[in-house]
Amino acid sequence: MLAVGAMEGPRQSAFLLSSPPLAALHSMAEMKTPLYPATYPPLPTGPPSSSSSSSSSSPSPPLGAHNPGGLKPPAAGGLSSLSSPPQQLSAATPHGINDILSRPSMPVASGAALPSASPSGSSSSSSSSASATSASAAAAAAAAAAAAAASSPAGLLAGLPRFSSLSPPPPPPGLYFSPSAAAVAAVGRYPKPLAELPGRAPIFWPGVMQSPPWRDARLACTPHQGSILLDKDGKRKHTRPTFSGQQIFALEKTFEQTKYLAGPERARLAYSLGMTESQVKVWFQNRRTKWRKKHAAEMATAKKKQDSETERLKGTSENEEEDDDYNKPLDPNSDDEKITQLLKKHKSSSGGLLLHASEAEGSS
């Protein structure tokens, strides 16, 4: 039994060092300093006669590795010290290989208790149980190493790219969306003010060019203005842009003064209102169309009203002329044709009178 335990120790240490994850975990555990003492409940030990079998199943420290925490390695003949490793390694960190393998929650204790429970076990059964115990301990150590790597911040951030000192720093957030930068760009593009344009008086009302609250370069590319959507057929669907009340008020005030804008005027108005030049251009086109329709309707109404007034005045003048001719006294010596025409116009009203007059003339 002692020979088997002595042979299993180097085999287990060689198995631990042969796998890269366990070797890396073991070296990391050696580099750590003890932060707090590990307190574990002592492992249940069997009778004194089975101490050799339990010691053969317990792992031994790997060859050629120094003991972390300044602990002395156990002596070769001290088998009683191998039966209780948690008491001697109480000052070490709880993340070492020996601490992980000697925890009571691992299947090491159950595997170690099997040969100790049968006092009449043979050497072959103890060696097979020891090899199974070492395999299960290696699997448990690999799982613990993976869990520790996943729980540590370094393991979570290991896959992220790192920026070296040679890479340029990121630009400041106000470089691209800055009203001052947009103002400098606009002044550089259109250096002349609107009042200095040849042949044009200043057309903007005073509140536009004095930094109104809606004058912001970030408002020129808002998603709700001129955004493009897709309908059910997958075709591009242009939505109608929406403007604020202040923008519409400024556009209306400018349209009252001029119906057409030059290129620099349109650019400055678009910048002052936080709009694009195309939006201002389209708005003025639509506004001119609306104004033409309204003006044409007003002109048609005025013409119709004027025509009706002219007809009324013409009818009134004709009636006045007829009344003047009718009110003139009849001359007996005048032409009979004129008298006949006047009588024909008023024959309905004076039919009986004409009959009596003709009879009187015939009798005479």
Swiss-Prot record:
Alphabetical UniProt keywords: Activator, Developmental protein, DNA-binding, Homeobox, Methylation, Nucleus, Repressor, Transcription, Transcription regulation
Looking up Pfam families in the UniProt record yields:
Homeodomain (PF00046)
Output the SMART domains linked to this UniProt entry.
HOX
Q: Name one GO biological process term.
A: type B pancreatic cell maturation
Compositional bias ranges of the Basic and acidic residues kind: 304-317
Chain spans, region Involved in DNA-binding:
306-364
Query: Which GO terms of the cellular component aspect does the record hold?
Result: nucleus
Instruction: Spell out the subcellular localization from the entry.
Output: Nucleus
Query: GO molecular function: any one?
Result: RNA polymerase II-specific DNA-binding transcription factor binding
Q: Where is the composition biased (Low complexity)?
A: 48-92, 109-134
Give the tissue specificity.
Pancreatic beta cells.
Could you tell me which residues belong to the region Repressor domain? 101-268
Q: Which residues bind DNA?
A: 236-295
The record ties this protein, via InterPro entries, to: HD, HD_metazoa, Homeobox_CS, Homeobox_NK-like, Homeodomain-like_sf, HTH_motif
Q: Which residues carry this modification: Asymmetric dimethylarginine?
A: 189
Q: Which domain of life is it from?
A: Eukaryota
Coiled coil region boundaries:
none
- Location of the region described as Disordered in the Swiss-Prot/TrEMBL record: 35-134, 294-364
Q: Which PANTHER family match?
A: HOMEOBOX PROTEIN NKX, HOMEOBOX PROTEIN NKX-6.1
Q: What is known of its domains?
A: The C-terminal domain contributes to sequence-specific DNA-binding.
Protein function: Together with NKX2-2 and IRX3 acts to restrict the generation of motor neurons to the appropriate region of the neural tube. Belongs to the class II proteins of neuronal progenitor factors, which are induced by SHH signals. Transcription factor which binds to specific A/T-rich DNA sequences in the promoter regions of a number of genes. Involved in transcriptional regulation in islet beta cells. Binds to the insulin promoter and is involved in regulation of the insulin gene.
The name this protein goes by in its record: Homeobox protein Nkx-6.1
Which species expresses this protein natively?
Answer: Mesocricetus auratus (Golden hamster)
Q: What is the lineage of its organism?
A: Eukaryota, Metazoa, Chordata, Craniata, Vertebrata
